[in-house]
Amino acid sequence: MTPRHLLAAGDLSRDDAIAILDDADRFAQALVGREVKKLPTLRGRTVVTMFYENSTRTRVSFEVAGKWMSADLINVSASGSSVSKGESLRDTALTLRAAGADALIIRHPASGAARLFADWTAGQSDGGPSVINAGDGTHEHPTQALLDALTIRQRLGGIEGRRVVIVGDILHSRVARSNVTLLHTLGAEVVLVAPPTLLPVGVADWPVTVSHDLDAELPAADAVLMLRVQAERMNGGFFPSVREYSTLYGLSDRRQAMLGGHAVVLHPGPMLRGMEIASSVADSSQSAVLQQVSNGVHIRMAVLFHVLVGLESAGEEGAA
């Protein structure tokens, strides 16, 4: 992990990732029993969120994380900024740097946008603001991978040696890419299940096993991560019909019964109930969907701490 940014899951060494997971747990514990959920950890720091794509879970959890750590939080949307008047992404980045922001959290539809932000705002004596990638096109979503890993660790007691099956639209999924990288770093075995049309070129070079048969992979799965079909990123027919896709790749009640009793079901959201996952499965005791949301806040607290304060234990800071 670079000292000031989190741009991709590959930025994290195994030790870095475990430190963030551990600190997320510590922050969660530090908040237990507090009537007012406020820690002084980032008091005096200015954090700017910039979301050029719609978001509920990621945006809200970053905002809650910043507020709970006492940061001064500023939200910038494309429609409410000079971007709507034609300002370039580079000029926006330089403006926020000049304004003195300590951290920039960016989501953008273009792959690589977060790294460009980091490059454009660097190079001066103070090093520029920290940049956190909240999702860039189909490229990366590192904090989602971290919260998924935390959820798996909490549910299963560990990640190393666990078999994680990722199902659905791998081609358009930044969540899948970040999860594959991070889970491999943490020692998990990753299986991708998708129709051939929803697998990216070059997937044979990824550290994964590829399958087209969901029924065959479920009995040995420790965790199943269901992905939404991202129709907004498609301009052609990737599968014959929603009904056929759901029949072949949806997590139904019948398929849930194939899972071991210990297995956990995850979904990064938003869920298309009745397509990739049945409502009964999403609301079952094996589902960790809401636990993922809660963990998202604590993971993003840990990430903000690590990029703004440093790669060290958050225990004393969190308990202050």
From Swiss-Prot:
Signal peptide: none annotated. Gene3D superfamilies: Aspartate/ornithine carbamoyltransferase. InterPro entries: Asp/Orn_carbamoyltranf_P-bd, Asp/Orn_carbamoylTrfase, Asp/Orn_carbamoylTrfase_sf, Asp_carbamoyltransf, Asp_carbamoyltransf_Asp/Orn-bd. Keywords: Pyrimidine biosynthesis, Transferase. GO terms for cellular component: cytosol. Carbamoyl phosphate binds at residues 57-58, 107, 141, 144, 269-270. Its EC number is 2.1.3.2. L-aspartate binds at residues 85, 174, 228. One of its GO terms (biological process) is 'de novo' pyrimidine nucleobase biosynthetic process. One of its GO terms (molecular function) is amino acid binding. Pathway: Pyrimidine metabolism; UMP biosynthesis via de novo pathway; (S)-dihydroorotate from bicarbonate: step 2/3. It catalyses: carbamoyl phosphate + L-aspartate = N-carbamoyl-L-aspartate + phosphate + H(+). Disulfide bonds: none annotated. Heterododecamer (2C3:3R2) of six catalytic PyrB chains organized as two trimers (C3), and six regulatory PyrI chains organized as three dimers (R2). Catalyzes the condensation of carbamoyl phosphate and aspartate to form carbamoyl aspartate and inorganic phosphate, the committed step in the de novo pyrimidine nucleotide biosynthesis pathway. Belongs to the aspartate/ornithine carbamoyltransferase superfamily. ATCase family. NCBIfam families: asp_carb_tr (TIGR00670), PRK00856.1 (NF002032). This is Aspartate carbamoyltransferase catalytic subunit.
